């Protein structure tokens, strides 16, 4: 992975609100976290150095409140859109086929 792509991914992660964003050359791993995301207990973005892809990790949800489920669904969809964009950056794509609007 070249440094230009790494920089673009790091910049995108910072725009998404992640803190302490970096890339470890030794492990080929993107390092980042988001302490301000209260919804990260339901779904979070992770990076797999084995597959060289970003993923959405969804945690078990236990609730009977419709409004809470809808909020979790919106958060998961936002995570999916972010992951699609980050993975497009990794492959060198400058544009996705569909326009994506990320609402934080």
Task: Briefly describe each language-model feature range.
Residues 1-32, 69, 86, 93-104:
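Negatively charged, low-complexity tracts enriched in Asp/Glu with abundant Ser/Thr
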Residues 37-78:
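Intrinsically disordered, low-complexity regulatory segments enriched in Ser/Thr/Pro
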